[in-house]
């Protein structure tokens, strides 16, 4: 009977350690996603502020598309939806930048802010995806995979990079 008690105790310790590790990683992951989301919100805000500066040079369809992207982004939290909107915004802004430069428009402060934002977002994406890798590895590996299935931990979605 003493052996059974020891085995149960060891299993309980392993279970608690695995659960706590997954819980901590989930909290870290949520923190990284929040940080990434805030950077993305700032980028969309920059785009929204830039549009009035170039409004007269952009065709109505492109302007409407950008405004729709900016408005649709607000309130989204799903990683895939957020990534799709982010990359769509970037593609649209490349077109706007080329139109602005072809019309000899220059906004150095805004360009610097937009480029700085891009670097911060890329760093946030890397940090978020690193946390996703850690938690997904735990969900896949024994014995934490058993704990994950019992407690409902599941794999997380990576923020795609293109």
Give residue ranges: language-model regions.
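A helix-centric hydrophobic-segment signal that preferentially recognizes long
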Residues: 1-162
């Amino acid at each position: 009977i003493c052996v059974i008690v020891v085995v149960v105790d060891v299993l309980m310790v392993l279970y608690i350690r695995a659960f706590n590790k997954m819980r901590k990683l989930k909290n870290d992951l949520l923190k990284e996603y929040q940080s990434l989301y805030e950077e993305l919100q700032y980028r969309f805000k920059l785009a929204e502020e830039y549009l009035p500066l170039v409004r007269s040079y952009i065709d109505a369809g492109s302007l409407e598309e950008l405004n729709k992207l900016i408005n649709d982004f607000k309130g989204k939290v799903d990683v895939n939806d957020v990534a799709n909107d982010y990359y769509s915004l970037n593609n649209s802004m490349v077109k706007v930048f080329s139109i602005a430069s072809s019309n000899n428009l220059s906004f150095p402060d805004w360009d610097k802010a937009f480029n700085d934002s891009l670097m911060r977002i890329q760093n946030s994406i890397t940090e978020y995806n690193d946390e996703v890798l850690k938690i997904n590895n735990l969900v896949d590996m024994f014995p934490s995979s058993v704990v994950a299935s019992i407690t409902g931990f599941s794999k997380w979605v990576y923020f795609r990079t293109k």
